[in-house]
């Protein structure tokens, strides 16, 4: 295997972990409405499950409200409303004519601190998963019996990339904590 193969293996696996983390963090409610909270919502419509964005326009109405305007209000308003309630995401939708208003209540300081703990827990999970990926990459290198110089070079490169991912995780954590503490 080439040097690039080991590096690509590590980077692809680490990128998947970071992408998953970013998606998970969008699900954590902050003080402001975030339409991404509905990204994983699948609505039963036209005989199949469809993502909300393919059935409605989702817009933010500051300071703490999201407006959902179904493209086909007669067919989809009630289904969207029901699915938001069923999703148990801490918001209460209200049907207002042909649109749905979703108010995001002010979260308490206690909830903010609980969310920060949750963020730290998720980030620690990703750190652990990155360590496993790094270990797997290093074992692949060792198993393939390269000369010592190449092996050391590959290990150093993987450690350098791992440090970059660790720094990226620290930044993601700081940004999310700042967002959670902003009132």
UniProtKB/Swiss-Prot annotation:
Protein name per Swiss-Prot or TrEMBL: Ribosome-recycling factor
Function: Responsible for the release of ribosomes from messenger RNA at the termination of protein biosynthesis. May increase the efficiency of translation by recycling ribosomes from one round of translation to another.
Similarity comment text for this entry: Belongs to the RRF family.
Subcellular location: Cytoplasm
An example Gene Ontology CC term for this record: cytoplasm
The encoding gene: frr
Entry-linked Pfam families: RRF
Keyword annotations: Cytoplasm, Protein biosynthesis
Species of origin: Mycoplasma genitalium (strain ATCC 33530 / DSM 19775 / NCTC 10195 / G37)
Highest taxon listed in the record's lineage: Bacteria
């Amino acid at each position: 295997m080439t040097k690039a193969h080991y590096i690509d293996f590590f980077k692809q696996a680490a990128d998947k972990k970071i992408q998953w983390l970013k998606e998970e963090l969008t699900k954590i409610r902050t003080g402001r409405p975030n339409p991404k909270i509905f990204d994983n919502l699948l609505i039963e419509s036209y005989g199949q499950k469809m993502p909300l964005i393919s059935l409605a326009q989702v817009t933010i109405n500051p300071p703490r409200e999201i407006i959902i305007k179904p493209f086909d209000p007669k067919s989809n308003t009630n289904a969207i409303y029901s699915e938001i309630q069923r999703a148990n995401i801490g918001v209460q939708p209200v049907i207002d004519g042909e649109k749905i208003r979703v108010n995001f209540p002010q979260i308490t300081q206690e909830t903010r601190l609980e969310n920060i703990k949750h963020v730290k827990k998720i980030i620690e999970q990703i750190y652990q998963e990155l360590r496993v990926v790094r270990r797997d990459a290093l074992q692949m290198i060792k198993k393939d019996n390269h000369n010592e110089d190449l092996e050391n070079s590959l290990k150093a490169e993987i450690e350098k990339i791992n440090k970059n991912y660790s720094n990226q995780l620290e930044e993601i954590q700081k940004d999310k904590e700042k967002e959670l503490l902003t009132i």
